[in-house]
Amino acid sequence: MEFVSEIATTIVAQFQKPTLAFLIGGMMLAALGSKLEVPQPVYKFIVLLLLLKIGLGAGISVREADFQALAGPAVAAVLLGVLIVVVGGYTLARWPGVSRVDGMATAGLFGAVSASTLAASMAVLDGEGIAYEGFIGALYPFMDVAALVTAIVLARMSSTERVETVVAASGAATLTSGGGGGRLRSGVDLDMLRGILVDTARSPAISALLLGIVIGVFARPEAIYESFYEPLFRGLLSILMLIMGMEAWARLAELRKVAHAYLLYGLAAPILHGLMGFGVGLALHHLTGFSGGGVVLLSVMAASSSDISGPPTMRGALPEANPSAYIGASTGLGTPVAILSIPLFMALADAFIGL
C-alpha cells in the first residue's frame, strides 16, 4: 500500500503544476462554452518555436554525445513505433464497426509522437530538476516516421488484399501478389514507400525538428538557444496546453460519429503504450545506463499520439480512412490522457529506478 500511496501522491502533486493545470483549464473553458479562441497562425508559430527548441537542444547534445549512447534508444524508438502500430491496428480491426484501414490510421497516430506531449513532459522534468539525456528530442523522428510509415504500408496492403478477395470471389479475375519490378508485397512498391518517407519528412513538425537538430549538430547555436528559446519555452508551452485542452474537448464530439471501440482505445492505449515504453526504457537503463528521466520521456513518447505531423500525413496517404475516427481518438482523447499520465510514469520510474 505504501508503494501505491507514493504513486498517488506524486500524481496529485503534478496536477498542481502549471503544465497540467493549463491543459485542464482549457478543457474546462471549452466545456463551459467559452468563446475564447487562439488564432491558428499563433498556434502554428508556438509549435514551430517549441519544435525548434527541442531540435536545437537535441542537436547540441547529439554533437557532444557518444554514438553508442544514442544508438540503443534510437533503435528502441523505432521498434516501439512499429510495435504499437502492429498491435494497435490489428486489435482495433477486430472490434465491431472498425475497418482495417481506419484501425491502422488510428494506430499510426498513436504510434507516432506528439510534440506538445513531449514538450510538456520535458517541462515537468525540468521543473522537478530531474536529469535526462539531452538527445531525447532526436528520438522523435525515429519513432514518428517508423509508426506512420508502418501504418500506411499495412493499410495499403490491407486495401489491396480486400480488393483481390472481392475480385477473386466474383470470378472476374485473379490478381497476384508480388512479381512487379520493385514490388515488396501486395499494393506496396518501392516508389510508394519512398513517397511516404518523403512526405513524412516534409511535414511541418518533422521538418522543423530536423532543422533544429541539424543546426544544433553542425552550428554553434548555444547563445541564441539560451537567450531566446529556453526563456520562452515554459510560457509558450502553457499557451499550447491551453489550446490542446480546448481542442481535445471539441474533438470529443467527433467520437459520437464512430464506433465505441475508438473511445475505449483512446482512453486505454496511451497508458498501455506508455507501459510498453517504460518496459523498454527500464531494459535500456539496466543495459546501457539510460537515465530515469530518459525512461520517463521514452514512456511519454510511446504514450503520446501525433497531433501535428500525423493527421495531414494520414489524410494524404489514406484518403479512404475516416478522419473523425483517427483524429477524434488521438486528439480528443489520446493527447490529454498521455499528458495527464506523465505523473504516473514519473512515479513508476521513481519506484523502480529512483529519480
Q: Predicted regions span which residues?
A:
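Juxtamembrane membrane-water interface segments of multi-pass membrane proteins
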Residues: K35-L36, A248-A261, A347-F352
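Alpha-helical transmembrane segments of multi-pass small-molecule/ion transporters
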Residues: E2-M27, F67-A74, V78-L232, L236, ...
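Membrane-helix interface "capping/anchor" motifs
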Residues: S34-V42, A93-D102, K257
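Short, amphipathic, aromatic/basic-enriched membrane-interface segments that mark the entry/exit
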Residues: T10-F15, Q40-F45, V198-A201, A261-G266
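Helix-loop-helix hairpins and the membrane-proximal interhelical loops
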Residues: L52, L56-V82, A253-L264, L282
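Membrane-interface junctions of multi-pass transporters
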Residues: A30-K44, I60-D66, R220-R234, R251-E254
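Helical transmembrane-bundle signal
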Residues: L50, I54-G57, S116, L240, ...
